[in-house]
């Protein structure tokens, strides 16, 4: 055996098989017909093409490849005319014209221009439905495919058209089981595009949505005909599919009625907040929080499960989420919920309590943050209009929370009282029985007279609650009361709707909502809790922040700013409020002086320093007068 590597026979044959052609030959059919005769010997043909092209280049003829391609196209097998072939997939969802594509149990293929069989996809695949989103008007395509003889059901994902139109993006379908890679991606794109074009009128069109709740045509997802879910998030798809009637309606109704007639107002408020969710947009309100908190082991999570079971699967981790996600994930969840309650459990898992306000403001805005799109412009902003029902072992509104956060939240502290007599049994029962009340409640809203009665009763509750209670709190509470009243009329018929007297203890007044009022109360308590910091006695080894004389705390401005910033209060905002409300004494140099300060000069620790002169409460200060209310009489109600 020689040491030289054997040269393939086809390579040895290529050189002698290519004649010497002239420039005139290249302008005729002669060389192209000669080469085309070797079309079935692909490797040899490529060798011959390379040598022929070299000859043409030597003769300064630059059109060789264009002439070759034209000759091949003119002499390749004629494509089947449009509509000659039809899809012949076993048990196919529908039959479509396939043009020159051969569509059978072995997949999709076509005849190439050299007469060869080209595989587009190794298994059956076809477009079956055009999907148009009711909100964005974006079109998607539902494709159907199945692989292997053991797969009886067709997989039918809904895919964005920009994915199906791109050979780079369509490869992502491999994650869903489609046999696509970089080799056949381009052919698969062409096939799906051609199939839609050939069968545009035959492929049915379906309306779709990517969220729960009210749709532009007045229907309510998922309780609507002719609308499918087209979202890309598989987790949201599972939640959407969980919005169905499961188990026994009478069993669920028994738990709900027992809760409504029970002693736990917090549990009843959670249920009312669930029914209130689709009413927020109807009554032209913004989203608001109902936060249930107290010691562990009293059934607060089961209260959330009861609220969730009105609509769908109440298991924690499915419809009910936790506060552990990012702000973006919470935005996505809120926009998916749309007009059903946004339910979040376990606030305490968040490490940074100062971000509580951010969550409240973000979710109560009802619109996602504006963000740039990858291809330029802005992303489509998402919207929601609902109630946000949350739970924790602590309040969500802190002493230093902004007034906007406080008024957007109804905080329900159940103390140590259990919400249910047997929380474990209630939880297990709800997991097996859910989804009945939501559909019936929405059906009741289709009656124009019911809608008008709803608006009337909400206005009456608003009027009865108005007074010292902050306006946003009044609006939220009136919606909760109206929702519970409507649920009683449409579902329960037990006369156990919440009353003004029952909800009022959880509402806050205008003064309680004012962050500066809360800052003043906190400061007074902080000063009282740190007496040594205001004692200039030489025996005091620690820091001296000021002195207290005649009911006035002279607080060194440096230390004052430090403690205020530590609690996330604004010193300048507070001092402006305190000056306007007579809570401080300050130096005054005249109306037109630019030297007016919010401080006074006071000797502390042997040196005169700028101090905030804060007037402390005295024994004569009166407690806030309770808000007086006129009870709403059932006889006056439209339900």
Pin down the residues of each PLM region.
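Conserved glycine-centered beta->alpha loop in an early N-terminal alpha/beta scaffold
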Residues: 3-16, 27, 33-265, 332-333, ...
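AAA+/SF3 P-loop NTPase mechanochemical coupling elements
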Residues: 373-390, 405
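Conserved catalytic/switch belt of AAA+ P-loop NTPases
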Residues: 357-372
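P-loop NTPase catalytic core of nucleic-acid-dependent motor ATPases
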Residues: 227-316
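DNA transaction DNA-binding modules
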Residues: 41-46, 50, 70-87, 203-204, ...
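AAA+/P-loop NTPase substrate/partner-engagement loops
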Residues: 302-355
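Phosphate-sensing "switch" segment of ASCE/P-loop ATPases
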Residues: 382-384, 400-494
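A short beta-strand-to-loop transition that corresponds to the Sensor-1 phosphate-sensing loop
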Residues: 346, 385-395, 413-415
């Amino acid at each position: 055996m020689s040491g030289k590597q054997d040269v393939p026979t086809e390579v040895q044959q290529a050189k002698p098989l290519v004649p010497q052609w002239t420039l005139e030959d290249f302008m005729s059919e002669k060389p192209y017909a000669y080469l085309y005769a070797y079309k079935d010997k692909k490797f040899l043909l490529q060798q011959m093409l390379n040598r022929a092209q070299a000859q043409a280049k030597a003769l300064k003829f630059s059109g060789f490849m264009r002439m070759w391609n034209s000759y091949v196209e003119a002499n390749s097998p004629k494509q089947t005319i449009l509509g000659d072939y039809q899809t012949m997939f076993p048990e196919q969802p529908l039959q479509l014209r396939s043009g020159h594509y051969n569509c059978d149990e072995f997949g999709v293929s076509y005849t190439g221009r050299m007469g060869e069989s080209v595989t587009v996809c190794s298994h059956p695949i076809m477009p079956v439905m055009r999907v148009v989103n009711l909100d964005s008007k974006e079109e998607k395509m539902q494709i159907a495919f199945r692989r292997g003889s053991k797969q009886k059901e067709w997989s039918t994902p809904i895919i964005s058209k920009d994915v199906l139109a791109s050979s780079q993006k369509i490869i992502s379908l491999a994650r869903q089981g489609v046999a696509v890679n970089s080799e056949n991606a381009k052919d698969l794109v062409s096939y799906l595009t051609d199939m839609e074009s050939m069968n545009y009128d035959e492929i049915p069109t379906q309306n779709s949505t990517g969220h729960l709740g009210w749709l532009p045509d007045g229907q309510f997802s998922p309780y609507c005909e002719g609308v499918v879910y087209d979202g890309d998030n598989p987790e949201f798809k599972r939640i959407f599919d969980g919005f169905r009637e499961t188990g026994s309606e009478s069993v669920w109704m028994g738990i709900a009625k027992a809760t409504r007639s029970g002693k736990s107002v917090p549990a009843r408020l959670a249920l009312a907040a669930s029914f209130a969710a689709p009413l927020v947009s109807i009554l032209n309100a913004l989203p608001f929080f109902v936060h249930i908190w107290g010691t562990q082991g009293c059934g607060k999570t089961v209260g959330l499960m009861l609220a969730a079971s009105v609509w769908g699967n109440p298991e924690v981790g499915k419809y009910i989420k936790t506060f552990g996600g990012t702000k973006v994930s919470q935005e996505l969840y809120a926009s998916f919920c749309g007009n059903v309650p946004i339910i979040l459990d376990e606030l305490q898992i968040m490490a940074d309590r100062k971000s509580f306000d951010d969550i409240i403001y973000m979710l109560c805005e009802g619109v996602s943050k504006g963000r740039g799109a990858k291809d330029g412009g802005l992303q489509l902003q998402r919207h929601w209009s609902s109630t946000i029902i949350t739970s924790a072992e602590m309040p969500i509104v802190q002493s230093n929370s902004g007034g906007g956060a406080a008024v957007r939240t109804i905080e329900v502290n159940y103390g140590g009282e259990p919400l249910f007599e047997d929380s474990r049994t209630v939880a297990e029962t709800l997991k097996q029985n859910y989804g009945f009340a939501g559909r019936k409640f929405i059906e009741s809203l289709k009656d124009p007279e019911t809608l008008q009665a709803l608006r009337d009763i909400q206005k009456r509750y608003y009027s009865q609650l108005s007074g010292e209670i902050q306006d946003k709190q009044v609006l939220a509470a009136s919606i909760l009361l109206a929702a519970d009243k409507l649920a009683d009329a449409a579902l329960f018929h037990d006369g156990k709707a919440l009353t003004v007297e029952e909800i009022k203890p959880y509402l806050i007044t205008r003064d309680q909502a004012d962050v500066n009022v809360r800052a003043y109360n906190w400061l007074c308590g902080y000063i009282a809790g740190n007496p040594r910091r205001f004692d200039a006695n030489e025996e005091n080894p620690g820091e001296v922040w000021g002195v207290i004389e005649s009911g006035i705390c002279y607080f060194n401005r440096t230390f004052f700013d430090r403690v205020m910033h530590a609690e996330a209060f604004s010193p300048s905002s507070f001092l402006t409020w305190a000056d306007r409300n007579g809570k401080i004494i300050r130096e005054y140099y005249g109306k037109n002086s630019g030297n007016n300060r919010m401080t006074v000069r006071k000797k502390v620790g042997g040196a005169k320093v700028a101090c905030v002169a804060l007037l402390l409460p005295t024994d004569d200060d009166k407690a806030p007068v309770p808000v007086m209310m006129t009870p709403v009489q059932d006889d006056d109600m439209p339900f």
